[in-house]
């Protein structure tokens, strides 16, 4: 049986980049589902997809307007949006071998046959950095945080809370998980709603919920980047003694977290793209406005199989839009 793959895109801006990502993933074995942040108008995202794939039938299945969520960075709202996407794919009746969460400003790095081959395996593309049982990251769960409540944000991290009696782990939000792993997560959350209640006022629960459930499951040995037992003070620090001191690989993504004080990864540029292409990542984030995709020579004329940038040859630094 030919495997199928579900892609979930969380989008909140840059409809043209979102549409280019959708177009780059257009394949008979891939179904794309999208959640557009309720804070923005979803119509430009629909229109952008129709513009790049005018002949395609349902190239994207969007979360319905009534089900969209206003997403706030660091809040449980991103977990809720991910669960809406999972519910939408479950409702389709289709069975998927793998489920992947992407951002609307992600860049596909590999040719589709290579992507399909990687997705057909059984590894859980997930990065788990640390257990939240001690150290500075414990403050993410032992104090109240209010990213989804603007009027209370000034109190975030100031109010202690009762201990959460669960073994908790933290890692990168972006994941690509087998259907077995997604099934474990879905059943766990259905059987124990306390998971989401306990982490509702954590900081960045999107980096905790799925990771913690899988680390306590039979799928834990299949997690591709499990660094929870490493001894380190700061999981982003490039001088860590841990083998995970490469802070650019996060599950299936290249994300440059080499700045230990950074609060957001920098936009992708040509040099970062070269590093991403030379590594194992399948996707990179995040691409800036004006970047379009995803095939053709590198800017200096260096052509290589699988190169996914599109740039003109007129001397302009602006990427050129290439349609396939």
Predicted regions and their residues:
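ER/Golgi luminal nucleotide-sugar-dependent glycosyltransferases, focusing on the catalytic module
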Residues: 1-306, 315-324
């Amino acid at each position: 049986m030919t495997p199928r793959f579900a892609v979930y895109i969380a989008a909140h801006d840059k409809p043209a980049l979102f549409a280019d990502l959708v177009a780059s993933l257009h394949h008979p074995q891939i179904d794309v589902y999208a959640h557009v942040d309720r804070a923005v108008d979803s119509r430009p995202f629909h229109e952008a997809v129709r513009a790049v794939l005018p002949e395609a039938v349902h190239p994207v299945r969007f979360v319905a307007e009534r089900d969209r969520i206003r997403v706030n960075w660091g809040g449980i709202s991103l977990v809720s949006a991910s669960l809406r996407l999972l519910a939408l794919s479950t409702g389709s009746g289709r069975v998927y071998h793998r489920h992947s969460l992407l951002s609307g400003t992600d860049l596909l790095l590999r040719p589709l046959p290579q992507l399909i081959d990687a997705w057909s395996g059984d590894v859980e593309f997930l990065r788990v950095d640390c257990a939240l049982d001690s150290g500075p990251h414990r403050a993410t769960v032992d104090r109240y945080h209010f990213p989804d409540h603007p009027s209370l944000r000034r109190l975030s991290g100031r109010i202690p809370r009762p201990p959460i009696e669960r073994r908790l782990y933290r890692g990168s939000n972006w994941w690509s998980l087998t259907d077995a792993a997604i099934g474990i997560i879905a059943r766990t959350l259905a059987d124990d709603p306390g998971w989401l209640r306990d982490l509702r006022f954590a900081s960045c629960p999107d980096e905790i919920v799925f990771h913690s459930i899988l680390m306590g499951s039979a799928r834990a040995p299949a997690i591709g980047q499990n660094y929870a037992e490493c001894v380190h003070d700061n999981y982003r620090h490039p001088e860590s003694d841990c083998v995970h001191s490469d802070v650019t690989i996060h599950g299936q993504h290249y994300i440059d977290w080499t700045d230990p004080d950074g609060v957001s990864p920098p936009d992708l540029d040509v040099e970062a793209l070269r590093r991403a292409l030379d590594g194992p990542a399948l996707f990179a984030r995040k691409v800036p406005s004006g970047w379009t995709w995803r095939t053709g020579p590198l800017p200096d004329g260096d052509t290589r199989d699988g190169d996914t940038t599109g740039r003109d040859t007129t001397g302009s630094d602006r990427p050129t839009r290439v349609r396939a």
